[in-house]
C-alpha cells in the first residue's frame, strides 16, 4: 500500500505546478499535462517516488542517520520545524547561512556561543551585568537561535538532507552534494532536479502540500527509529484514483 494516496495528494493540491512559462524542461517527465497555463504534476509518479523516499529515509533512520530538514520559505518554515522536532531530528527554516555544511567548524563556534549565552542566563550572570550588556546578549542570542536553533544539538554533519524547494535552497543543495550527502526533495516544475538523489515531484508552494509530504517523511524516521509503524500524521487512504480523475479535479479547480 502506498504511504500517501492519490486522494490525499489531490486534496492537498500537490498536483499544481507552476505557470508553464516558468517551467524547467528537466522536469518534463514528471508533468502529466497543462491546464490553463499551469503545469499539472503526474501524481502517479509522485505516489511511487514518495514511497521510495519513505523507504530511503526510514532505512537511514534505522541506521541512526542524522537527518536535516531544510525549508526557509514561509510556506515551509512551520512544517519543517514541527516535523523535524517530532521526528527527533534537526532543521533550518530561516535563511541558510553559506558554509553551514562546508564550513561546519565555524558554525559549531557560533552554536557554542549560543549555548554560552544561554548558560550565562541560567547561572545568573545576567543578574550582575549592566542592563545594556544584557540587552546586547539577548539580541545576539535571538539572532543565533533564529538561524541556528534548529541545529543547536546536531551532533555532526547530517547523513541525509530533506529539502522543500531546491530551487530556493540551491546553496544548501550544492553544499550537500559537495560533501556527498544524499538529498531528498520536494521538487516543483520550476526546479532543476539534477542534484537531487530522490525526487518527490510536488507543489512546494502550498502549505498543506508541504505539510503532507514533510509529515510523511517524519513518520518514516519515527518508524525507522522505533522499528515499527509510526503514529502517522496522515492516515493512508486505500482508495485508488485514476489519472483521469486528476484531470477532472484540475479542470474543476481551474475553471
UniProtKB/Swiss-Prot annotation:
One cellular component term from this protein's GO annotations in UniProt: cytosolic small ribosomal subunit
GO terms, biological process: translation
One annotated GO molecular function: structural constituent of ribosome
Entry keywords, A to Z: Ribonucleoprotein, Ribosomal protein
InterPro entries reported in the protein's UniProt record: Ribosomal_uS2 (IPR001865), Ribosomal_uS2_bac/mit/plastid (IPR005706), Ribosomal_uS2_CS (IPR018130), Ribosomal_uS2_flav_dom_sf (IPR023591)
SUPFAM superfamilies for the chain: Ribosomal protein S2
Signal peptide positions (record): none
PANTHER family cross-referenced by the UniProt entry: 30S RIBOSOMAL PROTEIN S2 PROKARYOTIC AND ORGANELLAR, SMALL RIBOSOMAL SUBUNIT PROTEIN US2M
UniProt similarity note: Belongs to the universal ribosomal protein uS2 family.
Name this polypeptide is given: Small ribosomal subunit protein uS2
Organism per entry: Streptococcus pyogenes serotype M49 (strain NZ131)
